[in-house]
């Protein structure tokens, strides 16, 4: 970036609409909404969110006027036409690794609110909001309640990958669940993309979310409460406070976290358990890195390997450290588009080496979002997946099918 007294010349990314692909689905007007429609700031949220991939990134060299912002009482000159996050990075503010305590920016979609700071006195996201002349920013938000976009709650009859199968009968409700916005993965067949890419919903504090979940549990008399997404672990402070509130309001209820496991660390898991979470599901998704990259849409091989390795590693840590305190489950994403039966067997061997008693749930990924062309696996196909895993020694295998979930002994729910 070259600076003059009042202008900055910089190379920047901008997103434009590919009119040939746009079908006017209005996803960008109702769910993932631009916060700077008059001037693209290159946050890329709409690029990742468009179901029809009708967004293109172009790079250009531009001149932007310098504007003044105040951060923690100190005045800075930054280029106009960029996000608050980029402006903060340009003046040396550090965004910590995803899953850390403090300021992070793990989703870059506007859903998780982990990047939020006080902007002109209001808690707001830095990743999708444009920097403005005269903006006053405070990085000290320790006394401000965290926020996150939440969908639900709703009662569920089956639950998620770690919902104890012995509680599921297919008739009564087993969990009251919420789904939180934002994710660090870019799965082209995201099964909850309307949640994952939501940056326009009203955010809730942890206590507000806990109160709604507790009310839902009371109405439907569910033995469990679940938090899914999107990816719940992106906003650490919000999630820990949520579980603390839930445990306070529901002292005897099973509290279930459904996570992809990519950014969970041992100390993060310890903090979750201490906060009252006693049911954790981790989804390594695949047995091979190449398959994982296909499923998650993470094209950076080193980043994909980091996420993939961590999800398996944290599953091992959970089993080794908390088998007596936490009900643990593992999840995998099956579709013949990306996974062979040979890889299914490899997954079985890897899980068996950790603990053959570990509950394993295999989801039959269906066509949606950007992979509308794939075919949903048949019931027979999923039963074969189940048989392969059981032949590798696994004791509790559940497969999701179009007719319902099928578990040990081929009991359906």
Please place each PLM-identified region on the residue numbering.
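Iron-sulfur cluster-binding cysteine motifs and their immediate structural context
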Residues: 14, 21-41, 45-61, 114-124, ...
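Glycine-rich phosphate/adenylate-binding loop and adjacent beta-alpha elements
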Residues: 47, 104-143
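N-terminal [4Fe-4S]-dependent radical SAM core
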Residues: 2-14, 93, 129-179, 192-197, ...
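Short glycine/threonine-rich loop-to-helix capping motif typified by GTGT followed
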Residues: 339-343, 373-377, 408-413
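Conserved AdoMet/S-adenosylmethionine-binding subsite of the radical SAM
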Residues: 208-372
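Immediate flanking context of iron-sulfur cluster ligation sites
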Residues: 15-16, 40, 89-123, 173, ...
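Flanking helices and flexible, charged tails adjoining ferredoxin-like Fe-S electron-transfer domains
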Residues: 1-14, 20, 42-92, 146-153, ...
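A cross-taxonomic marker for long C-terminal extensions/tails that follow the last structured domain
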Residues: 382-413
């Amino acid at each position: 970036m070259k600076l003059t007294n009042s202008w900055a010349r910089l190379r920047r990314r901008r997103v434009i609409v590919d009119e040939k692909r746009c079908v006017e689905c209005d996803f960008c007007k109702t769910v993932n909404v631009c916060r700077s429609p008059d001037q693209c700031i290159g946050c890329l949220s709409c690029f990742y969110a468009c179901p029809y991939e009708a967004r293109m990134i172009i790079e250009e060299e531009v001149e932007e006027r310098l504007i003044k912002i105040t951060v923690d009482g100190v005045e800075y000159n930054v280029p106009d036409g960029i996000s608050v996050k980029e402006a903060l990075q340009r003046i040396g503010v550090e965004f910590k690794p995803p899953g850390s305590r403090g300021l992070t920016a793990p989703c870059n979609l506007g859903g998780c609110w982990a990047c939020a700071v006080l902007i002109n006195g209001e808690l707001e996201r830095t990743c999708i909001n444009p920097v403005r002349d005269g903006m006053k920013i405070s990085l000290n938000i320790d006394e401000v309640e965290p926020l996150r976009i939440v969908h639900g709650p709703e009662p569920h009859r089956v639950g998620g990958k770690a919902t104890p199968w012995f509680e599921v009968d297919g008739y009564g409700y087993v969990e009251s669940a919420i789904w939180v916005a934002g994710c660090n993965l870019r799965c082209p067949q995201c099964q909850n993309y309307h949640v994952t890419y939501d940056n326009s919903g009203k955010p809730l504090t942890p206590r507000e979310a806990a109160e709604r979940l507790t009310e839902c549990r009371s109405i439907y008399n569910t033995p469990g409460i679940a938090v899914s997404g999107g990816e719940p672990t992106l906003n650490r402070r919000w999630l820990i406070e949520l579980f603390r509130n839930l445990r306070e309001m529901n002292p005897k209820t099973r509290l279930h976290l459904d996570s992809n496991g990519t950014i969970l660390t041992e100390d993060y898991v310890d903090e979750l358990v201490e906060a009252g979470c006693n049911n954790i599901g981790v989804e390594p998704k695949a047995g091979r890195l190449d398959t994982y990259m296909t499923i998650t849409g993470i094209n950076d091989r080193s980043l994909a390997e980091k996420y993939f390795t961590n999800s398996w590693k944290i599953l091992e840590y959970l089993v080794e450290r908390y088998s007596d305190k936490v009900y643990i489950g593992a999840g995998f994403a099956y579709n013949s588009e990306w996974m062979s039966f040979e890889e299914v067997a490899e997954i079985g061997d890897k899980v068996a080496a950790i603990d053959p008693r570990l509950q394993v749930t295999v989801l039959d990924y269906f066509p949606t979002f950007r992979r509308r062309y794939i075919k949903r696996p048949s019931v027979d196909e999923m039963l074969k997946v189940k048989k392969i895993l059981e032949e590798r020694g696994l004791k509790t295998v559940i497969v999701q099918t179009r007719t319902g979930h099928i578990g040990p002994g081929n009991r359906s729910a």
